[in-house]
């Protein structure tokens, strides 16, 4: 059966002809050598060019990263080797290396050595610690030396491929080859070593259109790979997968199974001839260099093939090798921090006859199934003995140890615990995936169908695109994960049982009430598992979360891609593994999970009994869970964080509790928030206290002015002046009728023009004094403008009704500060909207008229016109209303509807 490996294109960049490619070991970079003479670095994550080096005008046939030095080394047709620092782009070294075209450069993995091969038929060894001195020359080939590569298992040896139709293996320090492999009928273009530990192989590609796999210990050809229609120009063994890649001038890259040598896939991206292949150990990415650009592909998923049983024993596969570790070997004395790599001793368990693509313990942990290459093998977990095998594209366990295999899209077989076939199902649709658990599930790209294990009867069809399925141990809850979200459903097994036992018919949709949707959460799951009624998962944003009752809590932020292994209740820790098989653990208290589960079930008595066993530092997390369930009172009782308790108290309207927290915290923001809440609920005494604590002068101004509290306004005036809040102080003075203080405040604030305009409207007698100050101040900036200012003492003709305004001011000044009762507002509001000067001039001043009240309302004081002559030179007497009330701030001249805060332009001249 073929390997089921997804191949995804990760980068496609068009360029000049690419002669070699290399991958950086730590950065997301591809190094491409171009026939045009340039070397480019591409970032395959951002799909952009990072750097470009103009090396020469002739082709650059090979370049490599030297990551430990931050260098790149390049060999070109001008016979020079050049070394660049890829960070600074400085040229580190340039030297003539050969007498003909340089075909290849290879970097030693640990030593300061670089090998170069050339059309001069020589191989040279260069030592950069010795100033790039040539320390050795290897002679023996009789034609161009096309490629050299170090043996990763024995870095003291290397192989060379030549157009003399041979491959030679050399040792550093010896001028003669160790041996020669001769088998191709035409020149050999490329060579690569097998990186795995079990086979001493190398592969060669030739102009005879074949690739050959050699055993360099027996010096024999193991396999010849035929199928290309042109010269084979690039070959490699994939470092992580059981595949061999060959690239040809026919424009294709062929993928061969490394064990069976079966052709698995053929890739053709339409970029003409293939010249180079690049890979990196530990990665599934492969780079291909073409005539017209560079392609990067990713083969398969980088998910570690591993499984953990309920006791903490982990089994994983590295290639065909099976290894095991046991978390219990870490004693209680070793305190491992959350997220820290566990120091586990790896034990070799055995090997597998097929390449594992999935590995899973059965529910009781006795058996482990390995599935891959279209087959499955069931092993014993302890001794790794083969118990059963067969054909399968997929394998799943039931909760009681039975299992099912998907042989094809149209056939699923169910087996008993004794490994005997019990039932065969032919679904009426194309089954692309199957899932195990309480029910056997089969799905297409559009829907999933659940079947019972006993008879294979359909239980329910759900229309959703399923990527994974997770059953809770209780069998009552199941998570369906899709591309963008996941759904938590309740399985009503009693409803299903009664329906089936009663002989009820099952339609195309199954039993209608079999499942009940509880929650939908818009997160993409990477891996997940159930612990009780708690669903633990890590998402695409590298967060480790858990979900209880639809409430999602983030446990930790992961620093890399991790995959869940399982949860050990006796340690209260959840374990994860990365693709390098590093195991880490994170604490997740079982008591916390149990508490939340009991709350969701409505068992509050047992939940409260469990609460003391939860550490105090976790109580806020418990409170947030209760808040999410609408249980604010209970959350307030449990919460410990003062900020959080304050927020809860405010939500509940528990002002006394919030006040106690605010007193303890002495937080200005808390006092302000509490003051606003108290004001909105009518608790004005508390509001005043809170606003005073918060020093919220604007809030106090609103409160005192609304209450008509003159004493409060007086107190607020002092506070505002002390804090430099002149706007608040001005309004307080104005409402109190202290117009002289208003003017003085404007003058002190250097707002002299505004002071002049205000005095013209409210205190005409102060105008000459302020105009003098204004002239003096303006003289410093614009003397001409200062001279243009008119003083009413000198030019009374420029100020309309000036004398009347002075007389009215003198009459009403002693009456300021006397306030009418609030109950008379309606009477005052109905008075004519007319200034005193206008009233005098129109001779319609009546006793009932009143002046504006102390707080600046648009009402008028009563003025009587008894005995007033028409002459403006005569004294004007303005009487007050019978109740003695006057306005605190009298608009003597001008329209009161045009009052401004500190300014009024009515009838003032300059």
Swiss-Prot record:
One of its GO terms (molecular function) is structural molecule activity. PROSITE patterns: WD_REPEATS_2, WD_REPEATS_REGION. Residues 882-910 are annotated as: Disordered. This is Coatomer subunit beta'-2. It is a peripheral membrane protein. The coatomer is a cytosolic protein complex that binds to dilysine motifs and reversibly associates with Golgi non-clathrin-coated vesicles, which further mediate biosynthetic protein transport from the ER, via the Golgi up to the trans Golgi network. Coatomer complex is required for budding from Golgi membranes, and is essential for the retrograde Golgi-to-ER transport of dilysine-tagged proteins. SUPFAM superfamilies: C-terminal (heme d1) domain of cytochrome cd1-nitrite reductase (SSF51004), WD40 repeat-like (SSF50978). Oligomeric complex that consists of at least the alpha, beta, beta', gamma, delta, epsilon and zeta subunits. Residues 900-910 have a biased composition (Polar residues). WD repeats lie at residues 13-52, 55-94, 97-136, 140-180, 183-224, 227-266, 269-309, 351-393, 461-501.
